[in-house]
Design a protein with these regions (language model features):
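Bacterial N-terminal signal peptides that target proteins for export
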Residues: 2-9
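Extracytoplasmic copper-binding redox domains, predominantly the cupredoxin/blue-copper superfamily
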Residues: 22-108
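Bacterial N-terminal signal peptides
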Residues: 10-18
Length: 108
């Protein structure tokens, strides 16, 4: 049961390598204590964005953050870890799949 919740925190963001969209788009993901029957989750499990797009993580509930998972991001991308209980954002400039989790809840 605990491993099921871990999957809720491993989120992939897929960047399209060839974007025909000249305007950047934004996505917002809420950090939540509960969503439906799941606990300690992000409001969206997968988000598809283009290079240049920004994802905003909203600290709707307390006790959460966002951290890129080591080995789960494209080569050349710097590590990223937000502060707890704070809204944060990241602009994606390198195409690829980005895995991330909530640091205090990664082993649930």
């Amino acid at each position: 049961m605990k491993n099921k919740n871990l999957m809720g925190f491993i989120i992939s963001i897929t960047l399209l390598m060839f974007s025909t969209n000249s305007m950047a788009a934004d996505e917002t993901i809420e950090m939540l204590n509960k969503l439906g029957k799941e606990s300690m989750v992000y409001s969206k499990k997968v988000v598809r964005v283009d290079v240049g797009d920004t994802v905003f993580w909203k600290a709707t509930d307390k006790g959460h953050n966002v951290e890129f998972i080591k080995g789960g991001i494209p080569e050349g991308v710097n590590k990223f870890k937000s502060k707890y209980n704070k809204d944060t954002e990241y602009q994606f400039t390198v195409p690829g799949i980005y895995a991330y989790w909530c640091t205090p809840h990664k082993n649930m």
